[in-house]
């Protein structure tokens, strides 16, 4: 398609400053009032009034929240119901799970997991000992004839 006007860059070729006045008037952070959060209590106060919560200046001023110490935070290592179903035979061969009353007994902490999620399908009845499980995971295991037993998570 034919253009009616030259693109702005081509139109400005040879003009040195492309319509921004003296050299340096469209450079660095001085042309925008400073870098980052600079000036929010001075010349950019109108932005605080427009975008901040009324009266508090949030999120421009003050400290917000806290950083949880890594020693307190729990690192969740989840496994889906479908993945568990896939590895049951391998775990039985390796002797990592037992069988009790026609159901496999699986202790997730011993396998390196601490949460059971509900992705996938399971058709084998199992008894799963885990510190945490999602609602859908519990429903799927109970539907297959098994049960989920919640155990306390000992966190160091």
Swiss-Prot record:
Gene Ontology CC annotations of this record: cytosolic large ribosomal subunit
Gene Ontology biological process terms from the UniProt entry: translation
Gene Ontology molecular-function annotations: rRNA binding; structural constituent of ribosome
InterPro entries named among the record's database cross-references: Rbsml_uL15_N, Ribosomal_uL15, Ribosomal_uL15/eL18, Ribosomal_uL15/eL18_sf, Ribosomal_uL15_CS
Xref: Pfam families: Ribosomal_L27A
Leader sequence residues: none
Alphabetical keyword list: Ribonucleoprotein, Ribosomal protein, RNA-binding, rRNA-binding
Renumbered residue ranges of the record's region Disordered: 14-35
Subunit structure: Part of the 50S ribosomal subunit.
Family recorded in the similarity comment: Belongs to the universal ribosomal protein uL15 family.
Protein role: Binds to the 23S rRNA.
Protein name: Large ribosomal subunit protein uL15
Protein source organism: Pyrobaculum islandicum (strain DSM 4184 / JCM 9189 / GEO3)
Taxon lineage: Archaea, Thermoproteota, Thermoprotei, Thermoproteales, Thermoproteaceae
Gene name of the encoded protein: rpl15
């Amino acid at each position: 398609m034919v253009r009616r006007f030259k693109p702005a860059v081509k139109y400005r070729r040879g003009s040195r400053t492309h319509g921004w006045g003296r050299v340096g008037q469209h450079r660095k952070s001085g042309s925008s009032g400073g870098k980052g959060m600079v000036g929010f209590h001075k010349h950019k106060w109108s932005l605080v009034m427009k975008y901040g919560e009324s009266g508090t200046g949030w999120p421009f001023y003050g400290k917000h929240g806290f950083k949880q110490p890594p020693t307190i935070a729990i690192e969740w290592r989840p496994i889906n119901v479908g993945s568990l179903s896939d590895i049951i035979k391998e775990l039985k061969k390796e002797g990592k799970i037992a069988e009790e009353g026609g159901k496999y007994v699986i202790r997730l902490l011993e396998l390196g997991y601490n949460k059971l999620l509900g992705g996938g399908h399971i058709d084998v009845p199992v008894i799963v000992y885990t510190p945490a499980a999602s609602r859908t995971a519990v429903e799927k295991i109970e539907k297959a004839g098994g049960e989920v037993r919640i155990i306390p998570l000992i966190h160091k």
